[in-house]
């Protein structure tokens, strides 16, 4: 910010506008005008000596003509130099003004970018620490674990291929049969339970024995998964009502 204040100060602009033209004038004066004047005088000295030897009576007019020529040359050179200096000064001031405006705009854009970045980082930190986002993340992790559990029970490596209705139906059958494996085998032998259903039921029964969880709870987990994916069908609702003791309506 110190550089920006310096560039905006009137003293800095005055020094640039006055100091640079004066330095340029002195540079041109000592490097161009004075050496050129000395060369003209040196070249004219032998000519004056010759003319004095040939025409002694005309010495004074020759000197006057030479002085006039030298004065005209110097005046013309000064006019050219001053004209060039004015042109360069205008160009220099224009360039300084343009550069100053560009630098000012660049600094403003940089400040805006830094402010936007700071706000973005702050907003990102606020979102990541939001209790609402934490709850959503925990729910997603919980649903993911439930899907994994159900997938393992039905013997599928792809959770998307799990038939939740079929899984809940198997849990209902276990609850109705009070986890009696013999009764379930009799249903299988009579053809009321398919081999796929029997396979799933036996896996669920083994899982329940090892994890101390009920078939009703597993059915509720599967129903929650279906609800999370907006796939809670009327048939699933019917099976849940049976588990809750509400019977079957319609």
UniProtKB/Swiss-Prot annotation:
Predominant subcellular localization, coarse grouping: other
Q: Which residues cross the membrane?
A: 10-30
Q: Does the keyword Cell membrane apply?
A: yes
Disrupted-gene phenotype: The deletion mutant lacks flagella and is non-motile.
List localization entries: Archaeal flagellum; Cell membrane
Can you state the subunit structure given in the record?
A: The S.acidocaldarius archaellum assembly machinery and its filament consist of seven proteins (FlaB, FlaF, FlaG, FlaH, FlaI, FlaJ and FlaX). FlaX assembles into ring-shaped oligomers. Interacts directly with FlaH and the motor ATPase FlaI.
Please report the name of this protein according to its UniProt entry: Archaeal flagellar motor scaffold protein FlaX
Alphabetized UniProt keyword annotations: Archaeal flagellum, Archaeal flagellum biogenesis, Cell membrane, Membrane, Transmembrane, Transmembrane helix
| InterPro entries in the record | ArlX (IPR056538)
Q: Which residues lie on this side of the membrane: Extracellular?
A: 1-9
**GO CC terms of this entry:** archaeal-type flagellum; plasma membrane
Q: What does this protein do?
A: Component of the archaellum. FlaX, FlaH and FlaI form the core cytoplasmic motor complex of the crenarchaeal archaellum. FlaX forms a ring that may act as a membrane-bound cytoplasmic scaffold that guides the assembly of the archaellum motor complex. Is essential for archaellum assembly.
Q: Where is the composition biased (Basic and acidic residues)?
A: 62-72
Q: How does it sit in the membrane?
A: Single-pass membrane protein
What highest taxon heads this organism's lineage? Archaea
**Naturally occurring in which organism (per UniProt):** Sulfolobus acidocaldarius (strain ATCC 33909 / DSM 639 / JCM 8929 / NBRC 15157 / NCIMB 11770)
């Amino acid at each position: 910010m110190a550089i920006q204040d310096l560039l905006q100060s009137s003293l800095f602009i005055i020094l640039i506008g006055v100091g640079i033209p004066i330095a340029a004038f002195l540079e041109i004066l000592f490097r161009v005008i004075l050496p050129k004047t000395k060369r003209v005088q040196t070249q004219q000295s032998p000519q004056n000596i010759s003319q004095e030897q040939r025409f002694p009576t005309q010495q004074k007019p020759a000197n006057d003509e030479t002085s006039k020529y030298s004065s005209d040359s110097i005046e013309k050179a000064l006019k050219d130099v001053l004209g060039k200096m004015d042109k360069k000064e205008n160009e220099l001031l224009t360039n300084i003004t343009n550069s100053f405006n560009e630098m000012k705009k660049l600094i403003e854009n940089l400040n805006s970018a830094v402010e936007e970045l700071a706000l973005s980082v702050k907003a990102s930190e606020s979102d990541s620490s939001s209790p609402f986002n934490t709850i959503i993340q925990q729910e997603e992790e919980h649903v993911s674990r439930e899907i994994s559990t159900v997938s393992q029970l039905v013997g599928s490596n792809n959770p998307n291929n799990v038939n939740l209705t079929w899984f809940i139906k198997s849990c209902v059958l276990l609850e109705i049969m009070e986890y009696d494996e013999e009764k379930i085998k009799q249903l299988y032998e009579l053809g009321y339970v398919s081999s796929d259903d029997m396979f799933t039921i036996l896996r669920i029964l083994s899982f329940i024995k090892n994890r101390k969880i009920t078939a009703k709870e597993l059915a509720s987990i599967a129903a929650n998964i279906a609800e999370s994916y907006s796939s809670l069908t009327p048939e699933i609702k019917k099976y849940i009502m049976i588990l809750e003791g509400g019977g079957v309506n319609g």
